[in-house]
Amino acid sequence: MDFTEAYADTCSTVGLAAREGNVKVLRKLLKKGRSVDVADNRGWMPIHEAAYHNSVECLQMLINADSSENYIKMKTFEGFCALHLAASQGHWKIVQILLEAGADPNATTLEETTPLFLAVENGQIDVLRLLLQHGANVNGSHSMCGWNSLHQASFQENAEIIKLLLRKGANKECQDDFGITPLFVAAQYGKLESLSILISSGANVNCQALDKATPLFIAAQEGHTKCVELLLSSGADPDLYCNEDSWQLPIHAAAQMGHTKILDLLIPLTNRACDTGLNKVSPVYSAVFGGHEDCLEILLRNGYSPDAQACLVFGFSSPVCMAFQKDCEFFGIVNILLKYGAQINELHLAYCLKYEKFSIFRYFLRKGCSLGPWNHIYEFVNHAIKAQAKYKEWLPHLLVAGFDPLILLCNSWIDSVSIDTLIFTLEFTNWKTLAPAVERMLSARASNAWILQQHIATVPSLTHLCRLEIRSSLKSERLRSDSYISQLPLPRSLHNYLLYEDVLRMYEVPELAAIQDG
């Protein structure tokens, strides 16, 4: 049933007269002995109507008609008594009459709301004073979640009410069901004046909610720069961990949410143990996670490591690995990390294959990603197998750059990739001098693949063997550079041959130079 809308056909004649403040009609009805406790669809009786609509004379008549405390304390279906309704509307005279007639200043609704809370919520300071004079409890819960009047006044930034509540003994460290104090509320919602009053009254700037969040953390998260400045100048600790795992700090919140001014405030005050410390999480991860290039650059410019530490919390070995999940900001983030010296390794190449970012794969190769020795061969091969359907977009670049194809010739690669991909891999080897174990695996795969049988049965040409020999004498960083190969004192045809132009043409792989995009 809807308790918020009044249905006229459910209201008694006495209730209607009280609602309209029609003293003459009400007097006649009472003389006729009409009932004063008939409720409408909301459970509202005539006394509720008179209190809500500020019908002072009607209220007096109703109380005189039934002066028992039970009538004065009668509640609507939502648990509101007449005092709640009058307090919410700021009807000072009505509140005074009800209190003097025995209304309970600490009565609660079904949601545990008191008249005091409603007066605060609606900014009714005169009613608030009156309630306090009659014994209203300034402390304790005034709503179902434990949020009380000081929380509400801080949220609404009503300075006069906050000061009054504090003078009357309101507990400045009171907590709701989530462990949140009024000062925390002020910090969370950017209520600078509320925050200043509470700090001046001695409220704890380093209080923590049940989830360990601090006022400084929440202000940094929400981007309230002035509140952050005030908290820091008042002794808020930027190194107080704000989660159970003891790694999250205000600097992480600012970096993740993109609040550059707050980040500038926190960097010089935050202990650098979070940068690369064991079991910590660098705020560089937070900036990458939030996709904020400006925050990332600020952190790196101030000396934070672009490689950070392995982040088990997010499941990434480096900020570059995390960047792969940020599609729209990916290029900018990666470029910034590389600009400040981020190390690229095989895991990053593997992520390129996993997310099919082949242009980045080629870009990482040009940027000097190490091609060996590798510590994560299994992860790379696993993602390479899954990306082998599009091998022409990445494998030629890897092999031409000097990657040892023998690393790929493991059981999983030989058994899983297409015959075309497998033969292409063999083109970069002397397939007649492979290890016996590799030969056995190839023979097993070739047993039902005639093309593979034919290929491994042929003898590599002398020119191919010479190519392998020349390339083996060059370091991979030189093989990556077309310009270096072209400067060798050899005919142009040999330059092209060293770059496997014949193989690329045979497999219809686009010219490497034509797809060296970033």
Swiss-Prot record:
Ranges: ANK repeats: 9-38, 42-71, 78-107, 111-140, 145-174, 178-207, 211-240, 246-275, 279-308, 315-346, 348-373
Annotated compartments: Cytoplasm
Pathway listed: Protein modification; protein ubiquitination
Lineage top rank: taxon: Eukaryota
PROSITE patterns reported in the protein's UniProt record: ANK_REP_REGION, ANK_REPEAT, SOCS
Induction: Upon sendai virus infection.
SUPFAM superfamilies recorded: Ankyrin repeat (SSF48403), SOCS box-like (SSF158235)
SMART domains, sorted: ANK, SOCS_box
Residue span, SOCS box domain: 441-504
GO-annotated biological processes: intracellular signal transduction; protein ubiquitination
InterPro entries associated with the record: Ankyrin_rpt, Ankyrin_rpt-contain_sf, ASB3_SOCS, SOCS_box, SOCS_box-like_dom_sf
CDD domains xref list: SOCS_ASB3
Swiss-Prot/TrEMBL keywords: ANK repeat, Cytoplasm, Repeat, Ubl conjugation pathway
GO CC terms of this entry: cytosol
Family designation: Belongs to the ankyrin SOCS box (ASB) family.
Domain comment (free text): The SOCS box domain mediates the interaction with the Elongin BC complex, an adapter module in different E3 ubiquitin-protein ligase complexes.
Subunit note: Interacts with ELOB and TNFRSF1B.
Function summary: Probable substrate-recognition component of a SCF-like ECS (Elongin-Cullin-SOCS-box protein) E3 ubiquitin-protein ligase complex which mediates the ubiquitination and subsequent proteasomal degradation of target proteins. Recognizes TNFRSF1B. Plays a role in the down-regulation of antiviral innate immunity by targeting MAVS for ubiquitin-proteasomal degradation. Also destabilizes TRAF6 by enhancing its 'Lys-48'-linked polyubiquitination.
Protein name, entry field: Ankyrin repeat and SOCS box protein 3
Source organism per UniProt: Homo sapiens
